[in-house]
Amino acid sequence: MQKNAAHTYAISSLLVLSLTGCAWIPSTPLVQGATSAQPVPGPAPVANGSIFQSAQPINYGYQPLFEDRRPRNIGDTLTIVLQENVSASKSSSANASRDGKTNFGFDTVPRYLQGLFGNARADVEASGGNTFNGKGGANASNTFSGTLTVTVDQVLVNGNLHVVGEKQIAINQGTEFIRFSGVVNPRTISGSNTVPSTQVADARIEYVGNGYINEAQNMGWLQRFFLNLSPM
């Protein structure tokens, strides 16, 4: 008896786990991979007997006197000014109408068919109509503002910079993550080392969180399971 109960419990547990897997909705992050990059260490300088050494290790932060501070190497930082304001609106309507009418009868009927078709017994009249009206509309709005400092993780062959960055903010028992990646044209970088997000190509902005507040906003796995199975 106990053995059968154990088998029943095991089967029930497997069934519940299977239902959980069917109802689970995978979440793929927009910004994948590492969210930071370290500068590549340069070769050790070779002493040439001069007081000024033109070849300095990259870790020393050497920079020519007349060169600006704009990022151009892997590991350089850049501030992204988030200025996303996107809105979309769509509406559509359709009207269709159709009417039809048909009459059929015998004006003259032979005498031997009078009993069957006479006195308008064979007259047929049919009419029909069909009307369709449809309307639809959709509105969407998205606003995102703020600043985020990112790191150059790749220098493309045409001189553009691929940047990636992340900011984590812990609030009570939850953590907010802001991730960003995209391709920046160095010509769009201002003198203050900033660039608006509207001028970043292939921009990917992700704002997610974890904790009990984020979990409260998600539908339970059992509800999602019945929602997927419900025909309504």
Curated annotation (Swiss-Prot):
GO terms for biological process: bacterial-type flagellum-dependent cell motility. The keyword tRNA-binding does not apply. Pfam families: FlgH (PF02107). A lipid is attached at C22 (S-diacylglycerol cysteine). The basal body constitutes a major portion of the flagellar organelle and consists of four rings (L,P,S, and M) mounted on a central rod. A lipid is attached at C22 (N-palmitoyl cysteine). NCBIfam families: PRK00249.1-1. Residues 1-21 form the signal peptide. InterPro entries: Flag_Lring. It is found in: Cell outer membrane; Bacterial flagellum basal body. Disulfide bonds: none annotated. Keywords: Bacterial flagellum, Cell outer membrane, Lipoprotein, Membrane, Palmitate, Signal. One of its GO terms (molecular function) is cytoskeletal motor activity. This is Flagellar L-ring protein. PROSITE patterns: PROKAR_LIPOPROTEIN. Belongs to the FlgH family. GO terms for cellular component: bacterial-type flagellum basal body, distal rod, L ring; cell outer membrane. It is a lipid-anchor. Assembles around the rod to form the L-ring and probably protects the motor/basal body from shearing forces during rotation. PANTHER family: FLAGELLAR L-RING PROTEIN (PTHR34933:SF3).
